[in-house]
Amino acid sequence: VHTRRPLIIAAAVATAAFTLTGCVPNAGSGEAAALTVDSGADSCAVSADTAASGPITFTVTNSGDQVTEFYVLAENKLSIVGEVENIAPGASRDLTLVAQPGEYFTVCKPGMVGAGIGTTPFTVTGESVEANADDAEAEDAAVASYTAYVKSQAAELLPQVQEFVDAYVAGEDAEAKRLFPLARVSYERIEPTAEQFGDLDPSIDYRKPGAEAEGLPFTGFHRIEMDLWLDAAAENYPDEKIVALTPAERATLGEQLVTDITSLYDLVHSDDFTLSLSDITNGAIGLLDEIAAPDGKLPGEENEFAHTDLYDFTANVEGAQVAYEAVRDIAAAKGDEGAELTKTLDTQFAAMLELLATYGDYEGGFVDYSTVDQNARNELGAQLNALSEPLSQLTHTVLGVSAA
């Protein structure tokens, strides 16, 4: 995180009906296929793992003992194409969507926190379904889809940060170091949204120079990072006396991070939380700006002690891709310009993620970024530029205005 951004709260969200196309089906597209979902305490059973393209209604019954949610995810397991939430124990709710052919996943989230359970492949067969091009309806669907994604990532973030903080406070430094980059992934995917909330983001994710430049307490992820990698901190700041925090100081620092992440979760799940279409498009652009900034991931300054920048780099790209995909169909419908832009962005996002995958992955780990030489960083930068340049046109194409 580099600079403060103003609070942006706009437009409306949240419907129970989504489409996989981002558009609303024409009337007369046929009766909806009827599937049932049993969301239990430790299971998520869908009555079928395939359906024909067209309208589908999932009737979700909560047989567990916590309020639950049900999601239909895109093939990347990140983009949310449909979700129904706040299903009380014993209650049922319907999710109706229009399914285009493709591969998807279904998942339940008892307690509405964490990564969810029972993630299962779901295949839609048949021909593409015609959808109308009503701009307002398509925009509402895009905003609702991306808002659901933000909420989902915040829900995954909270237990990840708690696990990381627990290890850190317990003095389990090796485990805390392993968890540090993983605990940041969901945050980095939705960083522009987090930055909307005034002082919350600086408390969570400011680097040491940024906090000091603004006269703010140095807290959050990067303060813990500095304490875990003391040798690197001493090397980076040779004129300062860098000492290990006491157990009590660790506890206070960890508690503050969990409190801040809990506040973020509460804010994005509140009835007052809304996003606009421009929040989505400019957020996608902003995520790539975060990577390329002088104190960002590409130059290796974001995680200056841990050198785990490739985790953040990948998460920023993934978050930008999800934001782009939320508005992709709207952009593609904007004449030849939109069709060409989406074709280019599809190609460049795939190329960027393919290049990043040569350095590792979340499960097996990414290479230490300090071992990535300048030629390799230049290659990453060139591909980032090849993606960033067309992405910078997204707001103009979707809304007919320049990016903020």
Predicted segments with their positions:
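Bacterial N-terminal signal peptides that target proteins for export
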Residues: 1-10
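C-terminal motif of bacterial Sec signal peptides marking the signal peptidase cleavage site
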Residues: 19-22
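Bacterial signal peptide processing site
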Residues: 24-26
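N-terminal edge beta-strand
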Residues: 30-52
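Beta-strand cores of secreted/periplasmic/IMS beta-sandwich domains, seen most often
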Residues: 47-66, 93-107
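Beta-strand signatures of extracellular beta-sandwich domains
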Residues: 69-73
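Extracellular/periplasmic metallocenter environments
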Residues: 88-131
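Mature extracytoplasmic or organellar-lumen-exposed domains after removal of signal/transit peptides
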Residues: 128-404
